[in-house]
Structure formats: structure tokens, C-alpha cells
Amino acid sequence: MQSDVSIVACGSYDPAECRRAMEQVLAPLGGLDWVSPGMRIVIKVNLVSAMKPEEAATTHPELLCALIELLKARGASVVLGDSPGGLYNAAHLTHVYDAAGMRQCEAAGAALNMDFSQKTVENPNAAVARRFTYTAYLDSADAIIDFCKLKSHGMMGMTNAVKNFFGVIPGTMKPEYHYQYPKAEDFAGMLVDLAEYFAPRLCICDAVVGMEGNGPTQGTPRKIGALAASASAHKLDLACAAMLGMTAGDVPTLRAAVQRGLCPEKVEDLRITGDLSAFLVPDFQAPKAQGTVFFGQDGRLLGRLGNTAMRAFLTPKPLPQKKTCIGCAKC
């Protein structure tokens, strides 16, 4: 029976160590036997900001290179992509790619996404995000690999495989989505909808050095020493949350996934290959997940005024169509 989650030790970002760990973590999941020559694989990385690899905010290039080499050996073409906050254009992404060490991945044979087209879709099967706009380069993929970074997160408690899909929303649109889904539960539901819509074929977590404290960008690097993988973003998140001393109840995206039957509530119910207990970080400094994303939660006047103004500006509102409106007032 195939494992739900595979976890192996990876003590550093040494190239040989990364290659060994990558091969070892994928084996219990069937390896990369599903990859065939000519496939176009998009690796959805975490490039949250223009930060250096040693700052532990982004997926490390050495691990990416190990995966790229394995995929190229099977005849696949590989594209790396993400949409960090800010302008979704060549100038900004080039800056992020350079800072995060992605040129190393380019040298290993991967293309760095430079397609900045966008697409808006209806998603009738969603629980929350029934309509959203995303980065259309993903449409070219025969399969998506979600390669996330394990970090603390001020709103979601933890950012990992599911939260990584917020990177499909074009950068300048992200504040709009925060205001469209101001409550943590709604925002988490939106993230789960995105993860289900894009249905990654494989999810891998860089937990060699994670981030604790004021994540996802202003925290402190924390060595965990693990590489983890799963076919399920939700099950991977459940196992990784346990590493940080969290349960499904502590992470809004996991609560949403459990409610939808996408993963068990308890990590003990996962089929795990590897010793999860070897990677527990009992003193991990995690921020308390916030109930909303709005600023001014401490009640200060300027915060409340700014909050009110931004809510009025960004919150979606119905726009009646005079020719078809029947005056039912449901909107």
C-alpha cells in the first residue's frame, strides 16, 4: 500500500545530500514513474519575495535542482513559477528570480516562467472561491508539482502545501482577495478551493530549514532537517503541522480540509513512511493565527479608519444590470 506521506532526513543543502534525500523521499510514493518523455511539468515554488535562500522564506534552489535533474532524466521539460506580491511582470519577477537563486535552477535545465497572462474562471465545485483569476502559465502544464517551504504564518498559523497556491493569484490582486475573504475561515476555504482546482500531481516540502516567529517573511530561520512529500497537499500539511507541534485544529486550511473529508483529523491516521518523531520541533515559535486579515485589530483610530477605507474600496459589491433587474433585492 502506497504511503500517504514520506519523510526523510536532509541535514543540509549540500547538492549530494539534496539529491540523495530527493530520491529517497519519492520512492515510497512510487518515485517519478508517472513522468514520461515530452511531459511539461510546472513546479509551483514558493517565491514569496525577493529574498536570499539563506533567509529561509523561499524554496531552496539546491532541492529544486535535485528534482529538476530527476525530471529531465525522464525526458520532461520543466518550468518554475510563482506570483509573489507586487507587480506580476518581467521586471519584478526577474528581480525575485535573481534574489532567490533561481538562476541556478535555470542552469540545471528548468525554464523560469515569463508568461504573465491571466485567466478568470468559474469554479462551481468550490465551497468559497467560485470565481477567481489566476496565472495562466499553469494551463500549459501536463502536471503540477507543488514545492512548498515550511514556515510560520501570521494569519494561517502555518504556510506549506495548500497556502502555496495563493501564489497562483496575480501579485497585485492579492490584497483584493484578502479583503474579499477577510475571515480566516473564508480565506482558508479559498486556499483549499485553489489547491483542489489545480490538483498537484505531487507535493514536496522543503523543511530542511524552515521559518519560525513572524512568518512568512519576517521570521527567523529554524533548522528542521527534513524533506517531506505526498500526493496530497492536505495530508502533507497535516504531517508538517505535527512537526511544528500543531494539530489540524490549529491551522485553518487543515480545518477546512478535514471538514471536506480531504484528510484525516489526526496525524496518527496517516500512513507515513519515515520517522516523523525525529523531526518534531517542540519549541517552535508560531504566531497565533488571526481571525481576520484586516489591520487595526488593536482598536487604534488610524487603523480603524484605514481598515474602513480599504474595506469600502476593495470589498466586492453587486452591480445591478438595469435591463435584467427585476427588483427582488436578493443582491
PLM features: what roles do these ranges have?
Residues 329:
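Cys/His-coordinated zinc-binding microdomains
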Residues 1-326:
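N-terminal and secondary-structure boundary signal
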